[in-house]
């Protein structure tokens, strides 16, 4: 259909002049499109959660069986929590060890030309980061890694971490769904996650990205001569589309270039920006929607969708209007909004919802410089990190949201004098203990390192911003590491041994310690038999429970950090807007 020139002119003028309204419309377009695709995918994910063969199993079944024979495992070998979790840890440990050695000695391996290498601390941080699905990159130069390391280590760990997360979610759902005392076979769950879900979607997105102009080549760089100089500039190239696809589908977030999705070769235009947003939200959101199908309670799935959409809309609008208003005190953004650190082809609204989506999931990708966001804008982005990525990553979102659900059911049941039950299963002391440990561990992994870091004098010399901004930057850094998100605000030198090793330990604990707590709960549920409901428990599918769940998430998640938020982003915000409080301080 060819639209009349008058209509094209009208809408072009509307979006150019009515920036506030058009920005809100764009945000809802993003959310609407990703909701549609996630809903369609939820039926497919539900089949995987119910251990039913998908339509791809005719193609992938023989491949899965082949790898199971090689490692001597099969679906029939069901594991309890201890065996399942130990195999998960060992598999990840040896993958991480091999990856560490490959990067350390990459100069002796094929396709190592122009690779400058990494220090031991940066190597450790990089491997742990990609192993834990965090992708916190303390390096920005693509020449640090060889093609071999980029392809087999970085891309390989992206698949491994995503598959591990979804396998853990399969085990958790199986624990709620069955009563045989087993939560599955890790290796079978991992292979199904890769070949039935993650790999097919990655191939599809790779093809679309290549067609949209994202490079996919073994050429190391392209030499160009800008019109304003006679000097030749070498622009790095490589297998960008492949890495970009699994970066988003696997909710990894680590980019081929230091600017991540802010670099034109990773994210050329508005279409690829929308595609990447849909890519990193489709599996986490589809997994939550699939729960309503798996447990035969569509209202429960819709309730989870509404809760997540609340955070998307609230955070997205908060970040957008924070950037749209700019910084009046500094006379920034009167007419354009705060375009500092943003691509002009993408704009304020698309950058804002992209950043919010990247922190509500565990993706951590960025299409702009977060350090250039206004204090109000960064608060909107930061909320997702402080809530431990409520939508989560591939699989881990299901684990994270259920920790809040269990805690909310327990508190809500006490308030009205009913039995705490979830899916007709009694919530006992073990479930409460480990869900509480899971919810408390995340703030501790953020607050303790932040306090220690502020007491080390020589580290302050690497910061470029004033005190309140330093607290915000450290809060963002450690919250990103603890939630396995990987987005980085910057503003100080992160590539130094202290931060490389400290962030590495935080990422490991934030990934495997919490996953262990969550799988203990799955094992506990797996030995319980569902009871007939006689209106003895609260309804977990209605709007009242949704409001209670949102309240619990905000209270547990944000109050833990309230003093730091006040001393960091809120203090910066008051200064920027020249409020009375800011003037007094």
From Swiss-Prot:
Pfam families, A to Z: KdpA
Localization, UniProt: Cell membrane
Gene Ontology molecular-function annotations: P-type potassium transmembrane transporter activity; potassium ion binding
Bilayer topology term: Multi-pass membrane protein
Record keywords: Cell membrane, Ion transport, Membrane, Potassium, Potassium transport, Transmembrane, Transmembrane helix, Transport
Transmembrane segments: 25-45, 84-104, 152-172, 194-214, 275-295, 307-327, 345-365, 368-388, 397-417, 437-457, 502-522, 547-567
Assigned GO CC terms: plasma membrane
Keyword Signal tagged: no
NCBIfam families registered for this protein in UniProt: kdpA
Family the UniProt entry places it in: Belongs to the KdpA family.
Biological role: Part of the high-affinity ATP-driven potassium transport (or Kdp) system, which catalyzes the hydrolysis of ATP coupled with the electrogenic transport of potassium into the cytoplasm. This subunit binds the extracellular potassium ions and delivers the ions to the membrane domain of KdpB through an intramembrane tunnel.
Subunit-level organization: The system is composed of three essential subunits: KdpA, KdpB and KdpC.
Protein name per its UniProtKB record: Potassium-transporting ATPase potassium-binding subunit
Taxonomy of the source species: Archaea, Methanobacteriati, Thermoplasmatota, Thermoplasmata, Thermoplasmatales
């Amino acid at each position: 259909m060819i639209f009349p020139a008058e209509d094209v002119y009208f809408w072009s003028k509307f979006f150019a002049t009515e920036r506030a309204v058009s920005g809100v419309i764009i945000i809802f377009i993003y959310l609407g499109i990703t909701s549609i695709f996630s809903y369609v995918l939820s039926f497919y994910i539900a089949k995987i959660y119910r251990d039913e063969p998908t339509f791809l199993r005719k193609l992938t079944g023989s491949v899965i069986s082949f790898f199971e024979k090689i490692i001597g495992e099969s679906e029939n070998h069901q594991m309890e929590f201890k065996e399942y979790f130990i195999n998960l840890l060992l598999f990840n440990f040896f993958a991480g060890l091999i990856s560490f050695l490959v990067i350390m000695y990459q100069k002796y391996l094929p396709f190592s030309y122009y690779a400058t290498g990494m220090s031991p601390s940066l190597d450790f941080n990089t491997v742990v980061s990609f192993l834990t699905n965090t992708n916190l990159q303390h390096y920005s130069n693509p020449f640090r890694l060889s093609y071999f390391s980029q392809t087999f280590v970085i891309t390989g760990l992206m698949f491994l971490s995503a598959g591990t997360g979804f396998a853990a979610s399969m085990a958790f759902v199986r624990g709620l769904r069955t009563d045989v005392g087993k939560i599955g076979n890790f290796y079978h769950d991992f292979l199904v996650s890769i070949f039935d879900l993650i790999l097919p979607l990655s191939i599809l997105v790779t093809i679309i990205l290549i067609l949209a102009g994202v490079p996919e080549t073994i050429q190391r760089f392209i030499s160009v001569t800008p019109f304003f100089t006679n000097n030749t500039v070498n622009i790095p190239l490589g297998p960008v589309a492949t890495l970009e696809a699994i970066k988003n589908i696997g909710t990894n977030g680590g980019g081929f270039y230091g600017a991540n999705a802010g670099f034109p070769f990773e994210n050329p235009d508005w279409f690829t920006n929308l595609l990447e947003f849909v890519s990193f939200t489709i599996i986490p959101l589809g997994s939550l929607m699939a729960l309503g199908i798996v447990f035969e309670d569509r209202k429960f799935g819709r309730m989870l969708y509404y809760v997540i959409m609340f955070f998307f809309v609230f955070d997205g609008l908060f970040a957008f209007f924070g950037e749209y208003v700019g910084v009046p005190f500094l006379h920034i953004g009167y007419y354009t909004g705060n375009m500092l650190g943003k691509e002009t082809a993408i704009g304020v609204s698309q950058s804002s919802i992209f950043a919010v989506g990247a922190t509500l999931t565990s993706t951590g990708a960025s299409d702009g410089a977060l350090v250039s966001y206004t204090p109000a804008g960064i608060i909107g982005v930061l909320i997702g990190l402080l809530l431990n990525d409520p939508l989560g990553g591939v699989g881990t979102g299901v684990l994270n949201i259920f920790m809040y659900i269990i805690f909310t059911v327990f508190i809500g049941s006490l308030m009205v004098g009913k039995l705490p039950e979830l899916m007709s299963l009694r919530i006992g002391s073990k479930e409460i203990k480990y869900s509480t440990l899971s919810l408390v561990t995340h703030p501790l992994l953020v607050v303790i390192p932040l306090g220690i870091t502020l007491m080390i004098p020589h580290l302050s010399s690497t910061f470029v911003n004033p005190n309140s901004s330093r607290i915000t930057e450290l809060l963002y850094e450690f919250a990103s590491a603890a939630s396995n998100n990987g987005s980085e605000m910057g503003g100080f030198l992160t590539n130094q041994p202290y931060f490389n090793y400290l962030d590495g330990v935080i990422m490991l604990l934030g990934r495997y310690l919490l996953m262990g707590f969550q799988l203990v709960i799955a094992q506990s549920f797996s030995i319980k038999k569902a009871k007939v409901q006689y209106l003895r428990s609260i309804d977990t599918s209605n709007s009242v429970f949704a409001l209670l769940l949102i309240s619990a998430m905000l209270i547990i998640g944000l109050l833990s950090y309230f003093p730091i938020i006040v001393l960091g982003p809120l203090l910066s915000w008051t200064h920027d807007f020249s409020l009375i409080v800011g003037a007094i301080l």
